[in-house]
């Protein structure tokens, strides 16, 4: 998953406004950071997406993106 695909998946799953809020504000305990901070720290977009889906109860959206 590329960074651009991460953000496309966020918007497709949560919508533009809520998706941006989740990425910047929702603390993902398993990563010890928000999604934005985890990505900036070098965590793979795929791992961040998996944790975001789990934290928000949207495991059904886990595979909305393509696999490399």
What are the roles of these predicted feature ranges?
Residues 1-68:
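C-terminal alpha-helical interaction appendages
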């Amino acid at each position: 998953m590329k960074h651009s695909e991460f953000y496309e998946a966020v918007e497709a799953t949560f919508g533009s406004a809520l998706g941006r809020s989740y990425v910047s504000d929702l603390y993902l305990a398993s990563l010890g950071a928000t999604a934005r901070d985890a990505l900036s720290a070098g965590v793979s977009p795929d791992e961040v997406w998996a944790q975001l889906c789990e934290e928000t109860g949207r495991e059904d959206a886990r595979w909305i993106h393509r696999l490399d």
